């Protein structure tokens, strides 16, 4: 990753594995592994929280825990909240928290809560109306995964997409939304909806360190953003994107090695 010499790294969530049913002791060890990797990066990482980054969110009876399961992630990255915004190269990045803990057999779902939507309303009042926006989300807003790989997804669509994504997109309908970056499902995918590109960026672990996942090899998305002046040009003129495969080597840790 350092050899690419990026100006910025968007960490799309799931910095560790497990989270929902693993003990805090196990998760602490996995965070140490993640810390070893992240400290080797030469470029600033702007993180998004993923469902595996949660810390003991579910009790033994599968009900939601009363404590804040996001505290470990927030402490590690030095952030007060799991959603925020920042500007880079003329673009405003909106970093969202798309995981809602619900417990039960499907312990989470893709959802933007009311507090975050209220924050977004306030944030949009602060952002200049002509500033192009890049939306970053762990769980996808748009994906074909359920149509293409139905047995993998099962009966719960909230496992693979944000169920109230339109509550966010409707707030941005009169804004220059340039791009939506997504993660979670470990596939390399680009969709377009109403002229907006939705890019799902694969995963550095592929199929959890076991080769490709549904045709997508371990890798990462490389995006080149060109400064914008006087509004948005067509997508392919202002932003270029490609998926870069990473070599799978014995040095990559398997889940059992950090359990």
Give the location of each predicted region.
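Active-site His/acidic residue clusters
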Residues: 141-155
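N-terminal active-site segment of His-dependent metallophosphoesterases
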Residues: 1-27
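Extended active-site neighborhood of metal-dependent phosphoesterases/phosphodiesterases
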Residues: 21-132, 155-159, 163, 167-179, ...
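Histidine-centered catalytic micro-motifs
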Residues: 135-141, 178-188
């Amino acid at each position: 990753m350092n050899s690419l010499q990026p100006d910025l790294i968007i960490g799309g969530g799931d910095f560790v594995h497990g989270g929902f049913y693993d003990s805090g002791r196990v998760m602490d060890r996995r965070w140490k592994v993640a810390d070893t990797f992240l400290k080797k990066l030469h470029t600033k990482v702007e993180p998004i929280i993923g469902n595996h980054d949660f810390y003991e969110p579910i009790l033994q009876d599968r009900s939601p825990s009363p404590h804040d399961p996001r505290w470990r992630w927030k402490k590690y990255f030095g952030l007060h909240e799991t959603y925020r915004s920042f500007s880079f190269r003329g673009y405003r990045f909106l970093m969202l928290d798309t995981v809602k803990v619900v417990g039960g057999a499907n312990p989470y779902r893709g959802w933007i809560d009311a507090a975050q939507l209220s924050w977004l309303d306030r944030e949009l009042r602060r952002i200049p109306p002509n500033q192009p926006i890049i939306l970053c989300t762990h769980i996808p807003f748009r994906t074909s995964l359920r149509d293409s790989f139905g047995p993998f997804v099962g009966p719960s669509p909230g496992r693979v997409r944000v169920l109230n994504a339109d509550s966010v997109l409707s707030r941005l309908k009169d804004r220059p939304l340039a791009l939506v970056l997504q993660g979670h499902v470990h596939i390399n995918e680009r969709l377009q909806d109403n002229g907006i590109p939705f890019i799902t960026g694969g995963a550095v672990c592929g199929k959890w360190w076991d080769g490709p996942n549904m045709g997508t090899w371990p890798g990462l998305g490389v995006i080149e953003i060109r400064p914008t002046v006087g509004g948005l040009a067509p997508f392919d003129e202002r932003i270029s994107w490609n998926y870069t495969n990473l070599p799978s080597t014995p040095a990559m840790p398997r889940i059992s090695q950090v359990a």
